[in-house]
Amino acid sequence: MRLQQVIDRYEEVEARMGATSNTNEIIALSKEHAELRPVVEKARALMTVRKGLSEAEAMIASGDREMAELAEMEIDDLRERLPGLEQEMQLLLLPKDVDDKADIVLEVRAGTGGDEAALFAGDLFRMYTRFAQIMGWSVEIVDVAPGDAGGYKEIIANVSGDGVFGRMKWESGVHRVQRVPATETQGRIHTSAATVAVLPAPENIEIEVRADDIRIDTMRSSGAGGQHVNTTDSAVRITHLPTGIMVTSSEKSQHVNREKAMDQLKIRLYERERAEKDAARSEARASQIGSGDRSQKVRTYNYPENRLTDHRIGLTLYSLDRIITGDKLGDVIEALITEDQSRRLASLEAGA
């Protein structure tokens, strides 16, 4: 029945698209139509196979030898196709994360390990930048604190495009690197870490920020990497008093900075609200991969062995040289998505 309901809704959306002249409604309907199309195409294919199988079984049971022979020729093929179509249909009907299509704020920070941690943070950010290029996404650096020997103590960027959060959300957590630093004369392997945070930045975040709840400070503006921009106090820092969340923006225009800082504040408040809801659903999330918590150790990058291990799913790949360039990062992310889908399907089938 659920499949027919999806098809009915799809046909209703199609009819409304042809009947309305309201631009906003057309945009909303077009978006829903695009989301429903792959589900409906798979549903129709599944229903066709089920119907064909039912008809073939009826023909075999009819006692008509000629009809039964024709049915026998079809039934094996239909039975072979059915399980695959049913699983694909289940995957398409799994509950979606409402933020999967959202843009993100990406934050990479050096952790333990001093200069080597900052260099590793730089490697991670370059990996994400390259992956974004491959995916056709755009990257805008918002704030940078360079490392003393290269890399970054911290770098924050906006990443925009189709389905960014749905793929990048798997990167949140602690990333650990094992390698021989360039400054190491004895050839000893050092371990350091960097922390990655991925915050969804959906359009039109519906969060009200009361004027009484914020303090706005102005300060001297500096650009990415601390380069001096001008001599006016154009940079803006907004502090959200109830939570202690602080955001800054350092463009040349104070007006632009206020807007950007407020947008950043709303994103962080939205993430906080999202995290609280996730915590309330902790039992349901037990079957999913990781928590998105930036304190969770998610991955180890072992350079001497050219090995990457993702600890959440026990995945080990000996192609670190291709992953750290961003070229093969997609393989890791796809493995995480596939495993998450499998676990959620198993949870549904178990009645969880």
From Swiss-Prot:
Family: Belongs to the prokaryotic/mitochondrial release factor family.
Protein name stated in the entry: Peptide chain release factor 1
One of the Pfam families matching this protein, by short name: PCRF
Region listing for Disordered, in residue ranges: 277-303
Modified residues (N5-methylglutamine): Q227
Domain of life per record: Bacteria
A single Gene Ontology CC term: cytoplasm
Subcellular location: Cytoplasm
Gene3D superfamilies cross-referenced by the UniProt entry: 3.30.160.20, 3.30.70.1660, 6.10.140.1950
PTM remark: Methylated by PrmC. Methylation increases the termination efficiency of RF1.
Keywords for this protein: Cytoplasm, Methylation, Protein biosynthesis
InterPro entries hit by this protein: PCRF (IPR005139), Pep_chain_release_fac_I (IPR000352), Pep_chain_release_fac_I_sf (IPR045853), Prokaryotic/Mito_RF (IPR050057), RF-1 (IPR004373)
